[in-house]
Amino acid sequence: MQEPAYFPGFPMQNAPPTLLPTHWIFRPPMSPDFQMPSALLVHDYHQIPQSPQLPEGLQMDPDPLVPHYCQRPQPPPLPEGLQMDPGSPVNPGFQVYPLAPRVAPQVLPRPHVTGKAAIREWRGRTRYSPEQKSTLEKFFKKSKYPSFKQRQELAKSVCVMEYQIRIWFKNRRARYFREHPQERLKARGNQGLGAHTSTGDHACINAGATGDSVTQP
């Protein structure tokens, strides 16, 4: 029976590996005095170079599934006092400390204040000394509606801000009118009279500018 012919480059089923003859392999031209190193000599088939030998401390067990360059060296053995038995959960040489319990932050109790006083404390009410109060009360007897410039001067004299003086006079007027209801009616009448007078003066000024005559009521 004639054996089937094998052609290089066309593998057949159940065919042995094809080995190329030596004279088929390309060799570059060399001078007659050139000597090829023994590691580069071409044989009838390509040989896989062997990996270099590792030192004794780094030798590893061969693993057929992991290449030699992927294997990690084993860690050095621990001293006798630090070795742990596989059956014991904790080595007697180690001392395990329990976790410290969580402690809630200490919150200092606030003074118990109820009613309107609690609201005033929450808003940050300004507290005046007796000297400051006497200065403000003296000015309040002269004028219950100080101007912006007067409030600034009072603020400098009692060492507070201008808006604090404005709030103090607002609260002081409310308390004064609550204690003297008849004064509130007078204040409203004066405000209405002042508005009417200012309107009449404005009309007189406009009439004088245009040359018309305006009769005062």
UniProtKB/Swiss-Prot annotation:
It is found in: Nucleus. The lineage of its organism: Eukaryota, Metazoa, Chordata, Craniata, Vertebrata. It comes from Mus musculus (Mouse). The keyword Metal-binding does not apply. Residues 190-217 are annotated as: Disordered. Its main location: nucleus. Specifically expressed in early embryos. Keywords: Developmental protein, DNA-binding, Homeobox, Nucleus, Transcription, Transcription regulation. SUPFAM superfamilies: Homeodomain-like. GO terms for cellular component: nucleus. The keyword Transferase does not apply. This is Oocyte-specific homeobox protein 8. GO terms for molecular function: DNA binding. Belongs to the paired homeobox family. Obox subfamily. Transcription factor required for zygotic genome activation (ZGA), a critical event in early embryonic development during which the developmental control passes from maternally provided mRNAs to the expression of the zygotic genome after fertilization. Residues 121-180 bind DNA. Signal peptide: none annotated.
